A protein has these predicted regions:
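Structured catalytic-domain cores with a bias toward divalent-metal coordination
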Residues: 3-248
Length: 248
């Protein structure tokens, strides 16, 4: 209902059911929200949220952003948006990271074993997109951080991290993986790392779109240890800055 109300208030927004997720005792649609303000727009942006069902701030941020488009469509007159506000409806309903089959949807964009990843690829897999980003949360983090994929320039991500810090929110310093680590809230993921993840069959949605469909791709992460409204504020700050930077 929330999505329908926002979409109904703007003639340029459209809500589509792109497929149905079906499990024993559970069925739900996957929604795609499109904003097409005029023919011949300069930019096309894709963003997704809710691929992990226990990370609610991203899905809420996507809905709030859809509302913002409906209120001020003229602000985005040169931008076409494709938005997947909730990629894992079963996980969201049950507050669980995975889908009912136990698949991490955000590691399934190499093998496409899950219903959800298959539906998203079949609908949005062609691209290209000027920019793509995905909204997530981290139960182990203590602060905000952001991934950028195969992008040498840190100017934008530094600005986003600084804006988050200026709002009084913590910035993550200690996320360490096998080959990646956080440096003042930023994780640089090189292209060779994405190719490696493809070979291991563990591509995230952002890995997939960076490899095949967009030159500018980001993942926003907020710590679930903080209050929900704070996480939502951090997500929205990052989303607004990403969109503004690539639509100037």
């Amino acid at each position: 209902m929330y999505k329908r109300q926002a979409v109904a208030s703007s003639g340029s927004l459209n809500l589509y059911e792109i497929g149905r997720v079906s499990y024993p005792g559970f069925e739900a649609p996957l929604w795609r929200v499109l904003f097409r303000p005029q023919p011949g727009v300069k930019y096309k942006i894709l963003f997704s949220a809710g691929l992990h069902g226990n990370e609610p701030a991203g899905a809420e941020c996507a809905l709030r952003f859809i509302e913002a488009i409906a209120r001020s469509p003229e602000k985005y007159k040169d931008v076409a948006f494709d938005i997947i506000p909730l990629g894992n409806p079963w996980g969201w309903t049950h507050d669980i990271r995975f889908n009912q089959a136990g698949i991490d949807i955000n590691r399934d964009f190499a093998t496409f074993d899950s219903q959800e990843a298959k539906i998203i690829r079949s609908t949005l897999g062609k691209g290209p997109f000027s920019m793509m980003f995905d909204l997530h949360e981290d139960p182990d983090a203590t602060g905000f951080y952001i991934y950028q994929y195969g992008i040498e320039d840190r100017h934008l991500t530094r600005q986003i991290v600084a804006a988050i810090a200026d709002l009084g929110y913590p910035v993550e310093q200690d996320i360490k993986m096998v080959v990646l680590k956080t440096e003042n809230g930023i994780i640089d993921a090189p292209m060779w790392g994405l190719q490696y993840m493809r070979l291991t069959g563990q591509l995230s949605i952002t890995n997939y779109y960076r490899l095949y469909h967009s030159p500018y791709v980001f993942t926003v992460e907020t710590p679930t240890a903080l209050p929900f409204d704070d996480r939502l504020s951090m997500q929205r700050t990052a989303v607004d800055m990403l969109v503004d930077y690539y639509t100037k």
